[in-house]
A protein has these predicted regions:
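Residues lining hydrophobic/aromatic ligand-binding pockets adjacent to catalytic sites
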Residues: 2-141
Length: 141
């Protein structure tokens, strides 16, 4: 018996804060990443300008890696109107609580569906600045 479902590709997650650009790209290439999905609310960094929106896509392209910024998956969300505080009240961290509330919004759902569809076509890594995924909104994505 064969499985009729399409093959699933893994999604990778990466934070750029502890890596220089050459090491960052080497990690992506080593994992076979074809598309980097930037989920920073503000795709720039004062301390690491090589990861800014105006420079990173070109650097990745030289290595055959596509770049996409998905603002609707970006973090740093405030309280969401219409979502009762107890809905995601299990979060001790207010930032995660607010982001979990944001994840209930249609814009987030559409962006997540787009990410999943993209992940069926290309091996993707989801990127933010935070090196530790469990301290980043990527843990909810």
């Amino acid at each position: 018996m064969t499985d009729a479902r399409p093959a699933r590709r893994p999604f990778f997650t990466i934070g750029h804060a502890a890596l220089g650009l050459p090491d960052f790209i080497a990690v992506l290439l080593g994992a076979g990443v074809q598309r980097l999905v930037d989920v920073r609310a503000f795709p720039r960094s004062r301390s690491n300008p090589q990861f800014n929106l105006d420079t990173l896509p070109a650097a990745l392209a030289t290595q055959g890696i596509d770049y996409e910024h998905m603002a609707d998956l970006g973090g740093r969300r405030g309280r969401q109107p219409g979502v009762a505080p107890e809905v995601n009240g299990g979060w001790d961290n207010e930032s995660f609580h607010h982001y979990a509330d944001w994840a209930l919004q249609p814009a987030f759902g559409a962006a997540l569906a787009h990410l999943r569809a993209t992940g069926q076509r290309q091996c993707c890594a989801v990127m933010c600045a935070e090196s530790l995924w469990w301290r980043c909104h990527r843990r909810i994505i």
